[in-house]
Amino acid sequence: MAHTDGTAERPLGTVLVAGLGVSGAAAARVLLARGDDVLLTDAAEPAVLAELVAAGARWLGALSEPPEDVHLVVTSPGWRPDSPLLRTAAARGVEVIGEPELAWRLRIAAPGAEPAPWFAVTGTNGKTTTVTMLESVLLAAGRRAVAAGNVGRPLIEVVTARDADGTPAHDAIAVELSSFQLHWSSSIAPAGACVLNVADDHVDWHGSFDAYRDAKAQLLRLAPVAVADAGDPVASGLVGGHRHPVTVTLGEPERGQLGVRAGALVDRAFSAEPAGEVLVELDALQVRGPHNTVNALAAAALARVAGVDAAAVGRGLAGFRGGAHRNVLVGSVDGIDFVDDSKATNPHAAGASLAAYPRVVWIAGGLLKGADVDPLVAAVAPRLAGVVLLGRDREVLARSLARHAPTVPRTVVPSGDDGGVVTDGDSVMREVVAAAVRLARPGDTVLLAPAAASMDVFTDYAHRGRAFADAVRALG
């Protein structure tokens, strides 16, 4: 049971696994089970070290260059291309790949069959929602599907998993891939690929916006069908020259598109009917907002590539409930709704979230990572009832609000970045929510859509979202 070109059975020689988080540890386990010679490196000793060493791996501690006998480096997304270890490996001609590329090379298949196809999604925002929507649709169609990659389980675990009878455990994989993962991928050829959108993000890691965009485009290179949002100029431009482009639109779909007609999602890309085929009524979807309609259309497009009929697409999308910290209503108090979109970690995502509500008290701030917030603030100013700012880069947002929304009331909540004021994230969020309540009136939405990363005050975006929900519940 191997990948049809035999890669899954060939020894890889000595492999250095750089970074032992969830995906790195999973890669090391699979390599050890194959009998490969596995070396381990990381900045600090990981929790899984004893397990991996007991299985036969060798721990080398922190490295600035690979040992001379290394044939392959498998790196984790947190390792930048300009890190000394990876730069030295490249200079020596040692191949560097990520865990998804390793998974593609090592995927298994039943005798005489192809490995399970990948239906892959990337983009600045909406990846996780689209991939989990796609998983829901594939499961509704009776496929043995799973969401994996940058969401859920590591791909290397999924593509090598077997049922009790030894056959592959999955017959379709909904794959989320980040730009970091795609940077280290060269041969991944999904059956269908989607670039949802491309906005200014992660430029610090990639070095430039062009490099970031090109990493996203890598996903489309070997895919027979390429999907993008027609409303995103960069993403739609990437599929424009593809041999089989499909776009999704919030408007009436043309031939080759999926879109919206008379309150329903309609397929005019894969349906043989001249007018297209209705997939699902918009009112049947449990996730709201134009951005989620685009996500649903993209998931539907990839499901159609997988051969899923319209009825199953409709069932899968209607049954999808959405993920945590992604536009989730966490409570209503005195006629004010409180919505957690802590996953909106950049301006593009925050803009999509804000567009779903007519009058908003916006909770924003954190680590902007150099992103330009002026276009966002200018676009959303008319719907702002007030703004509460927190986090390290709150003053950047405050200056933008002064330029583009000078009449909107705003409150700045101090945090541990204020030299001498040391508070934990949960107490900061309680102050933030209290300030938002003072700015809101019945009918407003208090929206946590920070447009920034969370690690200045919180452990991660999930911690930020939980702190918000806890603070709302404490209002009574």
Region locations from a protein language model:
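N-terminal leader/targeting and accessory segments in enzymes
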Residues: M1-L106, R288, L475
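Nucleotide phosphate-binding/pyrophosphate-handling subdomain across enzymes
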Residues: H3-T4, A8-T14, A25-R34, L279-A385, ...
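Residues in the short beta-alpha loop(s) of Rossmann-like NAD(P)-binding domains
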Residues: G21, A44, V151, G231-D232, ...
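Residue-level signal for inorganic ion chemistry
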Residues: L31, V73, V121, N150, ...
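Phosphate-binding loop of NTP-binding sites
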Residues: L32, E68, P77-A230, V234-H244, ...
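Short internal beta-strands
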Residues: D36-A43, V227-A230, I363-A364, R383-D393
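Beta-strand->loop->alpha-helix junctions that form or flank phosphate-binding loops
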Residues: D42, G61-L63, I97-L102, V146-G149, ...
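C-terminal helical cap/extension that packs against the catalytic core
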Residues: A50-A57, L376-D444
